[in-house]
Design a protein with these regions (language model features):
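A short, flexible helix-boundary coil/loop motif
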Residues: 238, 242-243, 268-285
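A glycine-rich phosphate-binding loop feature that marks nucleotide/adenosyl-phosphate handling sites
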Residues: 39-40, 185-192, 250, 278-285
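Composition- and surface-driven signal marking solvent-exposed, interaction-prone regions
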Residues: 153-155, 196-197, 246-249, 272-280
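Amphipathic alpha-helical/coiled-coil segments positioned at domain termini
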Residues: 252-253, 257
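Polybasic low-complexity intrinsically disordered regions
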Residues: 1-181, 185-187, 194
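Helix-centered, glycine/charged polyanion-binding patches within enzymatic domains
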Residues: 178-250
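Hydrophobic transmembrane alpha-helical segments of multi-pass transport and channel proteins
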Residues: 264-265
Length: 285
């Protein structure tokens, strides 16, 4: 998962951001508001802080409801007082977007988690320290020998892993100039055994008809697949894939390509300096 540079999303944060944006919009257009609700929002923010406390949960829910009401009041006021030509041409789409964010409920699908990055989606990881991540799903493919990255794809939808395979294999074919015969994946990709001309191999129990050589070969290949995990870890920690600061889906693709290019360039530089060292050593000898 390539996480986006957004704060942890909550309904209260989104409502407060919408209210602040509407107040700035009114000030920019020179509209005199009946109320800006700035002082009330400070108190409501304090009430929402204790949402997890059993005795203060109802108070927090009321505070969230009040924040949404304030945002709707400001939207209606701006619709009345803004010039009609400016409203319908420039700001109507923006107001509809805010209303959609305010109408979101707990179990809704395709929710908006950020006002400046609306394409971000939630990915459930199931880890103890971080159960959910907010960004976009990424596929990385490397060679069996050399750990050179030959295919990277940024997905704009939260697809099942098996549904991401065709796009990744297509990108590998473009990069290498030839199709892959065998792709070794983890168990998250179960569901497909063949994609076009590529055989998908997953770690599973050996077949009865397999001889010892075939069993050992499959076991070694599946163990070799685990080498992609530290590569992804290095891309996140050393090559800025852990947090994406570029905007939009195009920014996701650019950041991923730059990280993969940096990884391959680093491997090429290491190989080049080793060759230079050996040549110099031979010359001195």
């Amino acid at each position: 998962v390539q996480e986006k540079n957004i704060t942890y999303p909550t309904d209260a944060k989104l409502a407060i951001k919408i209210i602040n944006r509407l107040n700035k919009l009114a000030k920019f257009h020179g509209i005199s508001q009946r109320r800006t609700f700035v002082k009330e929002i400070k108190n409501l923010r304090l009430s929402i802080r204790h949402f997890r406390h059993v005795k203060k949960r109802s108070k927090a829910r009321k505070a969230l409801k009040r924040l949404r009401t304030i945002a709707h009041i400001l939207i209606r006021e701006l619709r009345r007082k803004l010039p009609q030509t400016c409203l319908f041409e420039c700001l109507q789409e923006q107001f509809l977007f805010y209303e959609r964010v305010l109408a979101q409920q707990l179990r809704d699908k395709n929710k908006i988690y950020s006002l400046h990055e609306p394409q971000v989606y939630c990915i459930a990881k199931g880890k103890d320290h971080k159960q959910y991540e907010y960004g976009n799903k990424v596929s990385v493919a490397s060679t069996a020998k050399g750990n050179i990255i030959v295919g990277v794809v940024s997905h704009d939808k939260n697809l099942h892993d098996s549904h991401t395979l065709p796009e990744v294999l297509r990108h590998i074919e473009v990069t290498r100039g030839s199709a892959v015969k065998t792709a070794i994946c983890d168990r998250g990709y179960r569901g497909k055994s063949q994609v076009n001309e590529t055989t998908i191999q997953l770690p599973k129990k050996p077949l009865k008809r397999d001889n010892r050589y075939q069993r050992d070969k499959k076991r070694k290949q599946c163990r070799r697949r685990a080498a992609i995990e530290p590569i992804i870890g290095h891309l996140k920690s050393d090559f800025r894939l852990s947090r994406n600061f570029l905007k939009g889906t195009l920014g996701d693709e650019i950041n991923l390509l730059m990280a993969a290019t940096a990884w391959n360039l680093r491997k090429w530089l290491i190989a080049f300096f080793w060759w230079l060292f050996l040549v110099r050593k031979e010359a001195l000898d």
